[in-house]
Regions:
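Non-catalytic interface/linker regions that flank or bridge core catalytic/transmembrane domains
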Residues: 1-149, 153-154
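Short, charged helix-to-loop "capping" segments that act as catalytic/coupling loops
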Residues: 63, 170-181, 299-308
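Alpha-helical scaffolding flanking metal-ion-dependent phosphate/phosphodiester catalytic sites
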Residues: 162, 183-198, 209-311, 320
Length: 320
């Protein structure tokens, strides 16, 4: 191989140290070995690594593999996801929900700071599964969701709490299909993914938004829906991401859908979204108690904007 061709091939790849691979993890990018300037595929996307294979690579002298430069953002998300904490399954539901809440917040931070990859959506599905299983074991565990996060961390904690409240409401409504509950949980986790592209200064602005600023904020459902367009997700979480700001009256956004066109699952997440926003400290509002939030929803929103059955189910969850 001539020198210029070798340099050209090398310029398309970057080093990926084997010690960055984590036992029992799955890489969603191709990795190559370099044999005399020939880059040979070693592992394709979706490959699951074992401790034995990682040890074998080291013993064979392969301390580094190679990754296409175009996939570097995937490697960064892989490492961020792989370093997230695990949730101990021997904890009680009330303890486990707090651990899942912290895990969900850390995951959302990864989601907002990196590329949305296959590893990212796979992790969201696993968190949704853990959350659903925890709430099915004891629905009242949602009473232990924390209120410690101030507005600086609101965005990260908000999504996992919305997910938890949504599943609890769905269970209270009598929904028992575990896969459906996990889809609702997943939609809750991802519902605000479009806010990745909204300036933090707007999200945390203490004063009223100008019309152009409000237009940017209101764009996040469509942006989020576009962000997950290439992800392997079912219809329900996609609908939740796109339509969680719709209202039964038809006065919501982005499409002005009314109760005749909105999935029940979407309406559940809409209520959970509003409830958590009301009970959280924001830069522009003081946090309400749960009772104050329920009272506000009952007298200001229930008539036209909120699903009555979902509201009664939420009250049941919080007074169990």
């Amino acid at each position: 191989m001539n020198e210029s061709k070798s340099a050209n091939i090398s310029s398309n790849f970057d080093f990926f140290s084997v010690d960055r691979l984590i036992d029992n993890s799955v890489t969603d990018f191709d990795l190559f070995i370099n044999l005399r300037d020939h880059f040979i595929l070693y592992s394709g996307s979706g490959y699951k690594w074992s401790r034995e294979e990682l040890t074998h690579l080291f013993h064979a002298g392969h301390t580094s593999l190679f990754v296409r430069k175009q996939d570097m953002s995937k490697t960064m998300m892989y490492e961020a996801i792989a370093k997230l904490p695990t949730v101990r399954q021997d904890l009680s539901p009330s303890e486990r929900i707090r651990a899942i809440e912290d895990l969900g917040a850390k995951f959302t931070q990864c989601l907002f700071e990196g590329e949305i990859t296959e590893a990212c959506t796979d992790k969201a599905k696993l968190i949704a599964q853990e959350l659903t299983d925890c709430i099915l074991e004891d629905r009242s565990c949602v009473l232990n969701l924390g209120d410690l996060a101030g507005h600086d961390f609101y965005t990260f904690y908000h999504s996992i709490r919305v997910s938890a409240y949504s599943v609890a409401v769905a269970v209270s409504l009598g929904l028992s299909d575990v896969q459906l509950l996990r889809e609702i949980a997943l939609g809750g986790i991802l519902h605000d993914v479009g806010k990745r592209d909204v300036p933090v200064a707007l999200l945390n602005k203490s004063g009223p938004l100008s019309e152009p600023e409000w237009s940017i904020v209101r764009s996040h459902p469509r942006v989020g829906h576009a962000n997950i367009a290439q992800s392997i997700l079912s219809h329900i979480p996609r609908e939740i991401v796109l339509h969680h700001h719709e209202r039964r009256s038809g006065l919501g956004y982005p499409d002005g859908l009314d109760h005749r066109s909105l999935l029940t699952e979407v309406q559940i997440v809409t209520l959970a979204d509003i409830f958590d926003a009301l009970t959280s400290a924001r830069s522009y509002q003081k946090r309400r108690t749960r009772f104050e939030a329920l009272d506000f929803i009952k007298h200001k929103l229930l008539k036209d904007d909120i699903c009555p059955n979902a509201f009664r189910a939420l009250v049941s969850c919080l007074t169990a």
